[in-house]
Amino acid sequence: MVLLKEYRVILPVSVDEYQVGQLYSVAEASKNETGGGEGVEVLVNEPYEKDGERGQYTHKIYHLQSKVPTFVRMLAPEGALNIHEKAWNAYPYCRTVITNEYMKEDFLIKIETWHKPDLGTQENVHKLEPETWKHVEVIYIDIADRSQVLSKDYKAEEDPAKFKSIKTGRGPLGPNWKQELVNQKDCPYMCAYKLVTVKFKWWGLQNKVENFIHKQERRLFTNFHRQLFCWLDKWVDLTMDDIRRMEEETKRQLDEMRQKDPVKGMTADD
């Protein structure tokens, strides 16, 4: 049994802009989560081509420890709290698979994302079987809704309801910003349709952990996309060549930060 949910994140950026913004924000967010032996380690970041699909392949290890709930830390042996993330970014479609060497086929998080130039109105963009799709819970994430943010995650400088882009004039986002987008001819919009599959087979813990993982994914998607929009002026002028150079530098910085910096970033909400 697996737990399937689709998260829809609407943003006041274009699909093309998001490609750069996402990669910039992933690099920056990785630095915010790395230190004290924990965080992100980039093993591979290279172009790929397979079965007519072309894009960028990445393989990362997330060293978690304090970022998992206490009940898992108590049960899991040392080294079992590292997860491997393999991602195939054939933008505007991306596929990410997260596994754990200790749990092998009993643990899986799969995130499949379509980026579409709409306001989250398409049904079943991932073309699931009708019988499967009718059991998928759809969750809308509103990046400007503070009630969707945990108080310990809130930062005023990462609040789309307060941010005003100097370079683009976008923001701040009011309570009805999504409805207003339709009438704003000079402001692009898009939706990230993120289909998340979670499998965790551990007798007595399955439901608890699968629900915890979905809760954390929702938290990550919310915080990440709030940051992405509020960092708009930092990335909107960058090219993909700029991003690749930045990723190289970030890889070096992450290796250094993991060894020298204190633990930081999101911890498990026990």
Swiss-Prot record:
Pfam families: IP_trans. One of its GO terms (cellular component) is cytoplasm. Residues 250-263 have a biased composition (Basic and acidic residues). One of its GO terms (molecular function) is phosphatidylinositol binding. It is found in: Cytoplasm; Nucleus. The modification N6-acetyllysine is found at residue 215. The keyword Ion transport does not apply. It catalyses: a 1,2-diacyl-sn-glycero-3-phosphocholine(in) = a 1,2-diacyl-sn-glycero-3-phosphocholine(out); a 1,2-diacyl-sn-glycero-3-phospho-(1D-myo-inositol)(in) = a 1,2-diacyl-sn-glycero-3-phospho-(1D-myo-inositol)(out). Residues 250-270 are annotated as: Disordered. Gene3D superfamilies: 3.30.530.20. Phosphorylated by PKC in a calcium and phosphatidylserine-dependent manner. Disulfide bonds: none annotated. PANTHER family: PHOSPHATIDYLINOSITOL TRANSFER PROTEIN, PHOSPHATIDYLINOSITOL TRANSFER PROTEIN ALPHA ISOFORM. Catalyzes the transfer of phosphatidylinositol (PI) and phosphatidylcholine (PC) between membranes. Shows a preference for PI and PC containing shorter saturated or monosaturated acyl chains at the sn-1 and sn-2 positions. Preference order for PC is C16:1 > C16:0 > C18:1 > C18:0 > C20:4 and for PI is C16:1 > C16:0 > C18:1 > C18:0 > C20:4 > C20:3. This is Phosphatidylinositol transfer protein alpha isoform. It comes from Oryctolagus cuniculus (Rabbit).
